[in-house]
Amino acid sequence: MAFKKNNTKRIYNHGFNWLVAIFLLMFSSISYGQETSENLEHSTSLELSAEQEYNANKPILKDEFEWQFALDFSLVYDPIIIAGIEQDELLHYFMPGLLFDISYKGFFLQTNQRRSNALLGGTEFGYQLVVEQNWQLDVIAKAYMQGYDPAAEIEYSSGDEKLLAGLRERNVTLGIALRYSQYFENSLFTLDLAATTSGDDEFDKSVRGVIIDSFYSYLLPYRNWDIYFGAGLTYFSQDIVDYYIGVGSDEVNETRPEYTAKGGFRGQVEFYAQHPLSASWSFNAGITHSLYSSNVKASPLVDTNQVTQVMLGVLYVF
């Protein structure tokens, strides 16, 4: 149940390339050859729209074409529960990224900017099914779990060869979910019911499962800060957990017995804060503590069932 990106040789979600292509086709007919004054006018209207959305804290019908891009420059302490994989060089802590929000005719491609782990990878492609005054229902596609590549960790990231040698690569888990969002005055609750697919198991069969992901986020504005307090609970079905921390017959060695994992839960508490530095730059900081079911420690691949992630960085918004 590891949420890990190989910091030197990252594991990318190639399954979303086609989503980007769809958006390029959808918006290719839109002309960007406008006058400078019109571009400034358009940017101003988007800023006003974003401000209205923030103040209302209500569902926004994503009918018009709107976009926003941001460059992320973050230092992230990102431990995982898998033994033998650690950040041991300064470069491993630096995680730049591109965050983007695009919407048109109910379709959207977005990052969850209420959470610190959005900076660790949380792009969502979706469509609004129902939009009411205080709630909405969407269908989304996203990566729910990051994979890990033991061979790459050993070669590029100083992974522990004794613990990782002989393990198969674990791919990203992709999911298509029905998401319910309930808006309150200063908070938001979301619930995802996701059908997922991961890589192949030791028998070359695609691993499929279910993830039920819930999260509550409360916004506390303080002076010029946006401070978010969050808590979440996630259920992972047995097939998914076994794919990540189980040990197949082809992976057994003297210190690593065969192991079949059970389904499990992950609880999270989170603090995330944003502070504008200028019209384009903002400071971001977050800390997330994750606690997994105690039975995950029975896996020969796992040395702890709880991790704490810390992030400090700045964003440049176009």
Question: What is the predicted function of each stretch?
Answer:
Residues 73-75, 98-104, 125-127, 176-182, ...:
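Residues on the lipid-exposed face of transmembrane beta-strands in outer-membrane beta-barrel proteins
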